[in-house]
């Protein structure tokens, strides 16, 4: 990379850090181009991204954005995964890492909280925002359905009694 290109690359990483409250730092050594492409496409469908970064530039960007706490995670062949939705991103990356041993989760940051590999795996077990919304709606609808069932029960029981009496005669 030319010296003149480095400030632009740092600015790109700074923008990612500023716009994405959720970042996972990974090592991608040994992943094939097709595997990286599959991961990028999967992340893109979840409005997330995957960017291979030069460690020194990623550290400079981290220091410029006040994310000094993650600067020590940048060593080796590093790529960052970034998103606005931490749980969906974590699920996708953890599942991809399980299927592809060459992707290693190093750590990350979610809403300025530094996470280690174990914490990211635990995060991936949580429900996503859409799953939580669905569950809450289901819980809110359940009592109404039960009330309707209770109110309809006497009339349906009465109808069965009348039907049984009519069929005897």
Swiss-Prot record:
Keywords tagged on the record: Ribonucleoprotein, Ribosomal protein, RNA-binding, rRNA-binding
GO terms, biological process: translation
Entry keyword Ribonucleoprotein: yes
One CC-aspect GO term: large ribosomal subunit
Example GO molecular function: large ribosomal subunit rRNA binding
PROSITE patterns: RIBOSOMAL_L10
The keyword Ligase is annotated on this UniProt entry: no
Function: Forms part of the ribosomal stalk, playing a central role in the interaction of the ribosome with GTP-bound translation factors.
Assembly with partners or alone: Part of the ribosomal stalk of the 50S ribosomal subunit. The N-terminus interacts with L11 and the large rRNA to form the base of the stalk. The C-terminus forms an elongated spine to which L12 dimers bind in a sequential fashion forming a multimeric L10(L12)X complex.
Similarity comment: Belongs to the universal ribosomal protein uL10 family.
Protein known as: Large ribosomal subunit protein uL10
Lineage: Bacteria, Pseudomonadati, Pseudomonadota, Alphaproteobacteria, Rickettsiales
